[in-house]
Amino acid sequence: MVKEKPNSTRIYDQDGFRRRAACICVRNESEKEVLLVTSSRRPDQWIVPGGGVEPEEEPSATAIREVAEEAGVIGKLGRCLGVFENHDRKHRTQVYVLIVTEELPDWEDSRNMGRQRKWFTMEEALKQLRLHKPVQLVYLESLLTATNDKATL
C-alpha cells in the first residue's frame, strides 16, 4: 500500500506497518565504534540514521540513501541484522550494517537542518539510545549478539 504525504510517499506492508530501513554505521569490521546522528525532531538526542522505503526501492537501497542524506557517509553495505517492529509508530525497519569508507564534509541534512553526526564507542552508543531512542536499542543489541556469535565460532 502507498500513501502520498506532502513531503514524501510512504510505503506500507500487508499488515499496515510503514516500511523503513536503517544502518548501523561502523568505522571498520571490528564494529567497536558506531556513528549516530542528531534527531531532526530533537537535535539534542542521538539516533540511528534511517527512513522510509520509497516506491520501487529495495530496503538495502533505502538504507544506503538514508545514511548519505542523514549522516553524510558512504560505505560498504554489510549484513542485514533483521526486521525490527515498532508497534507504537507502526513501523517495520530493516536494519543493515554499513562499514563507512567516506565521510562527506558537507551533506544534505547538515545543510538543510543542521544535523550532526558523531562517532561513539559501542558502550556510549548503547547509553545514548537507552536514554533517547530505546526502540532503536535492539538494533545495536542485535549487532552485539551477532558479533559475539561470530567471535565464538
Residue ranges and their predicted role:
Residues 25, 38, 97-99:
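Short, well-ordered beta-strand micro-motif
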Residues 1-22:
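Acidic, metal-coordinating catalytic segment for phosphate/diphosphate chemistry
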Residues 47-50:
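A short gly/proline-enriched turn/hairpin at secondary-structure junctions
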Residues 40-43:
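Short connector loops/turns at beta-strand edges and beta->alpha or beta->beta junctions
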